[in-house]
A protein has these predicted regions:
Chain B
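Amphipathic alpha-helical scaffolding segments comprising HEAT/armadillo-like alpha-solenoid repeats
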Residues: 2-6, 12-15, 53-75, 96-108, ...
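HEAT-repeat alpha-solenoid elements in large eukaryotic scaffold proteins
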Residues: 16-45, 77
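Positions within ordered alpha-helical repeat solenoids
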Residues: 20, 24, 53, 93, ...
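Hydrophobic core/packing positions within alpha-helical solenoid repeats
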Residues: 33, 37, 43-51, 91, ...
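Hydrophobic core positions within HEAT/HEAT-like alpha-solenoid repeats
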Residues: 63, 87-89, 119
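Short inter-helical turns and helix N-cap capping residues of alpha-solenoid HEAT/ARM repeat scaffolds
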Residues: 79-80, 110-111
């Protein structure tokens, strides 16, 4: 048994490979998951349930959430005072269980995918029945962290620092590198002003999210079933209920993805479904369906990106309905379903942001002007970008009053609405319907859409 | 299913096809398949025109769909809501009060995609832009 298990700090202290590290800008979990957020000048730890959720992904459910939160808080306080080395020492002494076998498998998959070194940390436990392909799928969630992961790599793997000048702490935010796969991959790149600002927990969704995640947290903290003493096959399966059928409809190849950030553009025209597609489209018999049936999610990740987002939006709708009805039983059931589907976790920010109540236009506009990222939110152009509004002056499209920060799922819904023919638009899409209308009419239409989709008061 | 064989179908068969297309439409919306949404809209329009061509009473076959709520294990909430939404839009001139009530209920309580669409439909009605026939 080693230091990690007994709680004794490793003799190498901050120079040992590890999964927690800090820079002047925050505290990070390998490969680059932020555990703090910046509020003004202060660094604030993420809420304890979220800290636990992140760290337990690698270290297993035995992570002591309260102790972890205390250490992160102490380290963040050190960073606030500019004491980077002291913060590093605090983190190095954190009592974490060894990385679980599943955590290690996930780390290997992430390392391969991002091209970063995996810290040589202690591993303990026993393998689960999860297929290797599952870890490859889960690793995709970390793709967006590539640049951060590359810059933090020498901190999580101190041996790599030997190539740096002696006694000079490596600061990835001062010396960022271009990510692998680019022509200059691995080379230092200029600093940019778009620092990562993980602020998932700001905004009106906080109260709802806190309630929701408090339930999710308790479910996630349930210890996995251990093997019976005399059972020859020890590893228990990670997910328990019989896998429901996949969603009603499998995605087609070349499937369109839900619209992303800042697009607000009309889709390209092209071939639609064949008659067979329509004939074979969703039919009764879908598990997880309906309002008085238990809410379930597929155990395995659905094969298409569009499907993952679709499940996420269904979950968001169910949560909103349960919150509206103050149905705690339903909420617990949904949290349980989410806790057992690892693949949906990449959607949690979107699901929580979708619970935002309508806000005033000033709030939406001000939020868009704040800059930085908000996980679960997008900036939405009230008069859309794109050729359909090519006759609108660019200074109007880009004006602050035309840009609102809204929950990502709502953004996607609105964009899909704009691209779908509507009976009330004489069979035209709203984009087509608005052509030739005045700028003021288009803006008012955009506001009406925001109101009706529950974004604007 | 194509518009070509709608004319050969009974009202009840058309009603069944109406549900199938609406359910597919809900999925196309959920999956962000914009081209599919357009195709399904065209199919639904052809179906509705077939019903309309059979006289004012034929459309009443859609009235039960204003409160469409099949056995819950068989369908997702957004799929059922899309059936209600499409039926309500088509029945505004036939059973205006019932259809409007369905739209208002969807706008207030429906899944986000259908809620927004129902709300916008009501907005077009209030503005006098949409005149159901």
């Amino acid at each position: 048994m080693t230091a990690a298990l007994t709680g004794r700090a490793d003799a190498r202290g901050t120079m040992r490979p590890r999964t927690l590290a800090c820079t002047a800008d925050g505290i990070w979990l390998w490969p680059g998951t932020p555990l703090t957020e910046r509020r003004g000048a202060a660094l604030v730890p993420l809420p304890t349930p979220h800290l636990y959720q992140h760290v337990a992904t690698l270290h297993g459910p035995a992570v002591h959430a309260a102790a972890l939160a205390r250490v992160i808080e102490r380290a963040a306080a050190c960073l606030d005072r500019g004491r980077l080395e002291e913060a590093d020492r605090v983190l190095a002494a954190v009592l974490l269980p060894p990385v679980s076998f599943d955590g290690a498998a996930l780390m290997q998959a992430i390392g391969r995918r991002l091209g970063v070194s995996v810290p040589d940390v202690e591993i303990a436990g026993w393998p689960s029945a999860s297929p290797p392909a599952l870890f490859e799928q889960l690793a995709r969630v970390h793709d967006r962290k590539l640049a951060v992961a590359l810059t933090l790599e020498p901190i999580f793997n101190p041996d790599l620092q030997r190539i740096a000048p002696a006694n000079v702490p490596f600061d990835p935010l001062v010396h960022p590198r271009w990510p692998a796969g680019q022509p200059d991959g691995g080379q230092f790149r200029p600093r940019d002003g778009d620092a990562i600002v993980p602020v998932q927990w700001q905004g009106p969704a906080v109260r709802v999210a806190a309630r929701f995640l408090a339930r999710l947290w308790r479910l996630l903290r349930r210890l996995p079933k251990l093997p019976e003493p005399r059972e020859p096959e020890p590893p228990p399966p990670r997910s328990e209920p019989a896998p429901p059928e996949p969603p009603a409809r499998a995605p087609e190849s070349g499937e369109e993805k839900p619209p992303g950030v800042g697009h607000n553009r009309p889709p390209e025209d092209g071939a639609g479904p064949t008659p067979d597609e329509v004939e074979n489209s969703p039919v009764p018999g879908n598990p997880g369906a309906g309002h008085d049936q238990p809410f379930t999610l597929p155990v395995e990740r659905p094969t298409g990106e569009g499907e993952v987002a679709q499940w996420g939006q269904r979950a968001a709708d169910k949560i909103r309905e349960a919150l509206k009805n103050n149905d705690t039983k339903r909420l617990t059931e949904i949290a349980d379903a989410l806790a057992h589907a690892d693949w949906i976790k990449e959607q949690l920010d979107n699901i929580i942001a979708a619970q935002d109540p309508p806000r005033s236009l000033d709030e939406l506009i001000e939020a868009a002007q704040e800059g930085g990222r908000r996980f679960g939110y997008d900036n939405h152009h009230i008069i859309e970008q794109g050729p359909q509004n090519g006759d609108v002056p660019p200074n109007v499209i880009d004006a602050p009053y035309n840009l609102a920060r809204i929950p990502r799922y709502k953004h996607w819904q609105i964009n899909k609405y704009y691209g779908q023919p509507q009976s009330e638009c004489e069979g035209l899409t709203p984009r087509e319907y608005l052509k030739g209308k005045s700028v003021e009419q288009r803006y008012q239409f955009g506001l009406a859409v925001l109101r009706k989709f529950g974004v604007l008061k | 299913m194509t518009s070509r064989n709608y004319s050969e179908m009974s009202d009840e068969e058309l009603a069944k096809a109406f549900v199938e297309i609406s359910v597919s439409e809900a999925d196309a919306i959920g999956l962000g398949k914009v081209r599919t949404m357009r195709k399904l809209f065209d199919q639904l329009r052809a179906l509705k025109e077939t019903l309309r061509a059979r006289g004012p009473e034929a459309r009443r076959v859609l009235v039960p769909f204003l409160s469409y709520s099949p056995p819950s294990a068989s369908i997702f909430a957004d799929q059922a809501a899309q059936v209600r939404l499409n039926a309500a839009r088509e029945l505004l001139a036939v059973v205006p009060e019932q259809a409007r009530a369905a739209l208002e209920d969807l706008a207030a309580n429906g899944p986000s995609a259908q809620s927004g669409r129902a709300g916008m439909c009501l907005q077009f009605l209030e503005d006098g832009v949409f005149k159901p026939t």
